[in-house]
């Protein structure tokens, strides 16, 4: 799911940046701060700056922040390689290998949250804690009207949008914009399901953050939380490792602008 957020000015510069080889492509990354590593996975069509520009300075005060740009996004070149969640999750692991990071906390927003779920399933030994922000692990996690929009999306929707402006500012080849859009739109329109049974096997602590009107089906969200071990009476049994925060009066896009709120939940969870 995506929309056209306003551009966000990043307040600090990375301590290092570069490209890591990953499954036949070069994945762009930026590193900030020192401490325990936390990996940030952005939403569809976003760049690091657009998605995480306000949150990185806060996280980097006490942690090593590694922000990636997924296949075709931002600085990472467009590729005809098939766009699959399993391959993108493997790309994350390859970047970790390149940066010599054994394990890390992973934070994913929207499309990046889907990749974070996939990473948790296929690379559990590399995951410490998982933060999912307004993201689902199956198509049915979105409201029907959201899935209907995915199936009707056209490249023209993004013409001259802040998303295109952000892409043009950093993409190695701006002429790939339409090909990139076609690839992403095709992926968004395909039903997917990582599996209830698989989600229930995630052993890492999980924090889910959702906006009350972010397009996620809240009945499905409650089921997801239950699969992860939440939704219990903690007065009669131990507090679960899973946490759920539903932020009032927030849409899918506006949620990521609530930097202070999101940081307070994430910072407390990752302690």
At which residue positions do the language-model features occur?
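Flexible "cap/lid" loop of the alpha/beta hydrolase fold
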Residues: 114-122, 128-164
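Conserved HGGG/HGGXW glycine-rich cap/lid loop of the alpha/beta-hydrolase fold
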Residues: 25-75
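Active-site loop/oxyanion-hole signature of alpha/beta-hydrolase fold enzymes
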Residues: 60, 67-107
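Conserved loop-alpha-helix segment in the C-terminal half of the alpha/beta-hydrolase fold
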Residues: 57, 212-250, 256
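Post-His helix in hydrolase/transferase enzymes
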Residues: 255-268
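Alpha/beta-hydrolase fold catalytic core
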Residues: 1-38, 62-63, 271
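Active-site nucleophile elbow and catalytic-triad environment of alpha/beta-hydrolase enzymes
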Residues: 183-198
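Short beta-strand/loop motif that positions the catalytic acidic residue
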Residues: 202, 208-210
């Amino acid at each position: 799911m995506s929309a056209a957020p306003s551009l966000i000015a990043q307040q600090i510069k990375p301590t290092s940046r570069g490209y890591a080889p990953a499954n036949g492509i070069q994945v762009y990354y930026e590193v900030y701060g020192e401490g325990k590593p936390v990996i940030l996975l952005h939403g569809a069509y976003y760049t690091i700056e657009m998605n995480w520009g306000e949150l990185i300075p806060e996280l980097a005060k006490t942690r090593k922040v590694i922000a990636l740009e997924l296949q075709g996004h931002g600085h990472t070149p467009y590729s005809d390689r098939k766009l699959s969640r399993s391959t993108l999750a493997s790309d994350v692991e390859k970047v970790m290998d390149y940066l010599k990071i054994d394990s890390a906390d992973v934070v994913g927003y929207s499309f990046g949250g889907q990749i974070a779920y996939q990473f948790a399933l296929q690379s559990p030994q590399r995951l410490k804690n998982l933060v999912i922000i307004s993201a689902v692990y199956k198509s049915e996690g979105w409201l029907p009207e959201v899935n209907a929009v995915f199936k009707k999306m056209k490249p023209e929707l993004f013409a001259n949008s802040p998303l295109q402006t952000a892409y043009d500012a950093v993409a190695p080849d701006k002429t790939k914009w339409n090909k990139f859009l076609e690839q992403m739109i095709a992926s968004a329109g395909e039903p997917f399901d990582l599996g209830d049974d698989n989600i229930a096997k995630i052993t890492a602590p999980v924090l889910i953050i959702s906006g009350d009107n972010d397009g996620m089906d809240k009945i499905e969200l409650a089921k997801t939380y239950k699969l992860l071990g939440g939704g219990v009476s903690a007065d009669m049994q131990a507090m679960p490792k899973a946490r759920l925060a539903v932020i009032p009066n927030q849409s899918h896009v506006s949620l990521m602008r609530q930097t202070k709120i999101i940081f307070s939940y994430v910072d407390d969870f990752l302690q």
